[in-house]
């Protein structure tokens, strides 16, 4: 392909045979008073066959600095070859050749030709023209470290003391007559190589001197990123960001993500020139934004839910779907469940989901679909339906606490967009800021700031997962292939993101709002009867929402919810009814209740002075989780109720006691081996049992009607001598901890 481009001596001969053009004067030759950097004499010419997001990004940067841009090729078929993988690009020269006929005789006209899909302008026309005139060239090409496409030509390049040695055709600037004189010689195929064409002209010493051709060796104007990523850093001003080349201490005007540096350009484009600034924040978050009108029905959405592994708190996730702030008659639900374990949870919620959404489809584990196949099926159902305007993919480990999430993402008006979600208190999130060479996770310089929302905006990232919205039209026109997730051996989300990136579609991430969080699923053990109980470490926020009483925080804040039925005996809400029920069910499922005898092999000494029928938390593997509950919730309440006392919340004895009239109905008077004791009622008096309660003998005071989920907190040894009152009917359960023994 490249061999059809003629030798440089033949090109020189052809150029010498051309009719003479009006002389082109350099800045130093111009009469005094002439303006060598008049922006009105500058035209930026670029090439684009389609209005991709990269092209729009280029135009946004041009508009920010008030450049005049002329685009060649819009709407036309690209015949220039697969330039991302091999040689080609000659079609650009053919288009430019035709366009330059208009400017052939305009001596003061300066043309800058650049690519568009992978280019960002970083400074003003005035700075650009000033630097060009200072170069003393009539035609200045960008430079890079690689002699592409023919390494055999490297020795013919002039030696360079400092800077990049080789020509890159992705950007050049020059006087119009000079550029016209060069491109006029193009008589080759569209898929011949444009860079080889320009290279062979430049390598002829006579031609180089005659036409004053040169390279931007130190990236004063053009910064090609390929081979130079270590040289480039962001330079933050208050209202503007640009890049700095630290190798040459220059501030390039044009940033070109040539070769395999498209993702790095996307990262830089999040900031340059005004994507995000320290003072102004996000500069284009509201660009092209749409507002869903209140009086009209919003777009139709396919909500695709994926339960691909055992997932904590799934019933709460399913109920949260009903709370989306979006008309349910405009949402169709697709739900793929890959876990037999979760079938009862989905069966319980399915009638509500059926009644709520306009249409529903359930694909269960019996279909034996892989995660990728299920995702392909769901996405294609939107793709094939012209009425499907948006596709909302949501994994079961994504906790959307903001009911307006769907509406917010649609109004952002991007082809693909995800809400930023992360695990509570951790840096694990649903996006990657960069990719490693093998396309796995790499941490971008701004990753922590984005996850912690120290920088808030709209970000172009290489990978998203677990929750995202895609335009239906984008699926139908730009992602028409059915197998997007299952097209390779990689993770389905990685395959999807690669497919989107390869199409030139940006993966946007918004952290402008608090959308929710991610669940950790790696330690979810479904061998337990109620595995959610064990999630206090991995998913503490969701655990609290499910298991800590809704009024606990108010009680801790002193809002009058703590009662004192007896001296120094405090009564406050601690656990939800669900936790009480699940604790009891776990104990009964385990079933190995002690016999209420003094001999007890579970204790170090083998003897219990005041025996009860009980099961220790250690026996069911819940000791660590219960101690964490004591540290997190009981400790702060204790220090609030007993000022001046600091608890270490150590507890060796943590157990559930069962009282029955025919088993052990009561407990004789005793002191507890603790500094203070926690006693939580786990079921309802009058419903589950009759009788019961606790009497403090020294004060002749009793708590005879314990409330389910409420905790009694009282001193243990010395002062609060107490007994368990008889249970006369049913079964009474309490949870007891002897704290700080």
UniProtKB/Swiss-Prot annotation:
Region of interest (Required for glycosyltransferase activity), residue spans: 28-293
Alphabetically ordered keywords of this record: Dioxygenase, Disulfide bond, Endoplasmic reticulum, Glycoprotein, Glycosyltransferase, Iron, Manganese, Membrane, Metal-binding, Multifunctional enzyme, Oxidoreductase, Secreted, Signal, Transferase, Vitamin C
GO CC annotations, alphabetized: collagen-containing extracellular matrix; endoplasmic reticulum; endoplasmic reticulum lumen; endoplasmic reticulum membrane; extracellular space; Golgi apparatus; rough endoplasmic reticulum; trans-Golgi network
Catalytic activity: L-lysyl-[collagen] + 2-oxoglutarate + O2 = (5R)-5-hydroxy-L-lysyl-[collagen] + succinate + CO2; (5R)-5-hydroxy-L-lysyl-[collagen] + UDP-alpha-D-galactose = (5R)-5-O-(beta-D-galactosyl)-5-hydroxy-L-lysyl-[collagen] + UDP + H(+); (5R)-5-O-(beta-D-galactosyl)-5-hydroxy-L-lysyl-[collagen] + UDP-alpha-D-glucose = (5R)-5-O-[alpha-D-glucosyl-(1->2)-beta-D-galactosyl]-5-hydroxy-L-lysyl-[collagen] + UDP + H(+)
Region of interest: Accessory region: 298-523
Start and end residues of each Fe2OG dioxygenase domain: 650-741
Sites where the protein binds Mn(2+): 115, 118, 256
Record text about domains: The N-terminal domain mediates glycosyltransferase activity. The C-terminal domain that mediates lysyl hydroxylase activity is also important for homodimerization.
UniProt protein name: Multifunctional procollagen lysine hydroxylase and glycosyltransferase LH3
Record organism: Rattus norvegicus (Rat)
Lineage: Eukaryota, Metazoa, Chordata, Craniata, Vertebrata
